[in-house]
Amino acid sequence: GGGRRHGIPVSWSETFIENDKAGLGALGDIGCYSIDLVMNALGNPKPLTVTGTATDYFGTTPEAYSQVGKPECAKKFSVDDFASAYIRLEGGIILDFRIAWYMHLDTPGDTIIMGTKGSLRIPSTDCWNGSFNKPMTIYHDVAGEPVETVVPLLPATTDLFDRKIRSFLNAVITGGEAPVPTSQIIYNQAILDGIQRSSDC
């Protein structure tokens, strides 16, 4: 998961906070990226079950908008500002997920992938463009001893956002395959939908 300490997006547009326009709040705005990161790292296993909750405790209070000077947004707020879920994936994989637009923490924590042969810690980031500002760490055993292997950050040789746009345009122009397979998008959206439906029960 991930999130923002005080980051309900209303400084330039209020469409993110209105259910009839956005459908989802933090869950759909930034939660999709957190889920995509983990699903991609795991090889995009099929989601089996989702149990989740989504709340609006902060977005409905005028205090949540004090930094942007828009207390009237509290009356318009009709989406989630926090969501959490327990997601079972194919292969016996369990995903514990949290995302927030507003919280009294700097982060709900790093992304941690735990396995039987080792674990991977992906540092939390405020950036949602697929880049990291801290190295990842692999926790594993070597010769029966627990060790930590830091995965160094490699400097980007090109602009990652530009590469994403160009790969999409190339697929459109040449009629080639989409850079992201449809199944990955469907799995991501199924998880988001499952969290919201579970919360509505």
Regions found by a protein language model. Give the residues of each.
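Predominantly a Rossmann-like dinucleotide-binding segment in NAD(P)-dependent oxidoreductases
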Residues: 1-76
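Conserved acidic
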Residues: 26, 157, 177
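Secondary-structure boundary/capping signal
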Residues: 45-47, 93, 176-177
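A structural signal for well-ordered alpha-helical segments within the folded catalytic domains
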Residues: 28, 32-36, 159-166, 183-190
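NAD(P)-dinucleotide binding in Rossmann-like oxidoreductases
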Residues: 55, 73-164, 181
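C-terminal helix-rich "cap/oligomerization" subdomain common to oxidoreductases
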Residues: 90, 143-146, 153, 166-201
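Phosphate/oxyanion-binding loops and surfaces in catalytic or ligand/nucleic-acid-binding neighborhoods
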Residues: 41-45, 119-120, 192-198
